[in-house]
Amino acid sequence: MAHNGVADVQLKAGSAYGMTVAVISASWNADITDQLHEHSIAAAKEAGAQVSEWRVAGALELPVAVAAACKRFDAVVANGCVIQGETEHFRVVCDAVTYGLTRAGMDSGTPVGNGVLTVDTHEQAVDRAGGVDAKEDKGRDAAVAAIHTALVLRQIERGV
């Protein structure tokens, strides 16, 4: 699914056959994260990947779980939803999660799809969660990005 500002990367059915993918999603803001989680799993399975899934409490718990999964899986997808509140907590959480997910991928060499929404309002999250009439599907996008990157890394390793 192509969106304004998002690369038009698509996976062919079966292109990830034999690949293992972990989908780890926060439980906080479950009306949003449940959709992100389900859509990430669906995208990975459509590509032929073997999927394992877990839930953690909130976005701050994602980096450590993702780092552990990076040791055992070909690609990892992290989903969550952080909505701006009245304090600096939003910025602190967003920065920590983004840094942690990026570090997990860089330290391990395993692609991490970042499906953590960082939005000002619940309505913005709904528009990005892939539901009916949503403008975007960030859960699917994160899975596709992680799997596509894993496939590119395989090509690089083979010198193709």
From Swiss-Prot:
Q: Which UniProt keywords apply?
A: Riboflavin biosynthesis, Transferase
Which residues does the annotation say bind (2S)-2-hydroxy-3-oxobutyl phosphate? 86-87, 128
What does the record give as EC number?
Answer: 2.5.1.78
SUPFAM superfamilies reported in the protein's UniProt record: Lumazine synthase
Checking InterPro entries in the record gives: LS (IPR034964), LS/RS (IPR002180), LS/RS_sf (IPR036467)
Q: Which GO terms describe its molecular function?
A: 6,7-dimethyl-8-ribityllumazine synthase activity
Query: Catalytic center at which residues?
Result: 89 (proton donor)
State where 5-amino-6-(D-ribitylamino)uracil binds: 28, 59-61, 81-83, 114
Pathway(s): Cofactor biosynthesis; riboflavin biosynthesis; riboflavin from 2-hydroxy-3-oxobutyl phosphate and 5-amino-6-(D-ribitylamino)uracil: step 1/2
What Pfam families does its record include?
DMRL_synthase (PF00885)
Question: This protein's superkingdom?
Answer: Bacteria
Q: Which GO terms describe its biological process?
A: riboflavin biosynthetic process
Please tell me whether the keyword Isomerase is annotated for this protein.
Answer: no
Q: Which GO terms describe its cellular component?
A: cytosol; riboflavin synthase complex
**The family this protein is said to belong to:** Belongs to the DMRL synthase family.
**What HAMAP family does its record include?**
Lumazine_synth
According to its UniProt entry, the function of this protein is described as: Catalyzes the formation of 6,7-dimethyl-8-ribityllumazine by condensation of 5-amino-6-(D-ribitylamino)uracil with 3,4-dihydroxy-2-butanone 4-phosphate. This is the penultimate step in the biosynthesis of riboflavin.
- Name of the protein: 6,7-dimethyl-8-ribityllumazine synthase
Gene source species: Corynebacterium jeikeium (strain K411)
Give me the gene this protein comes from.
ribH
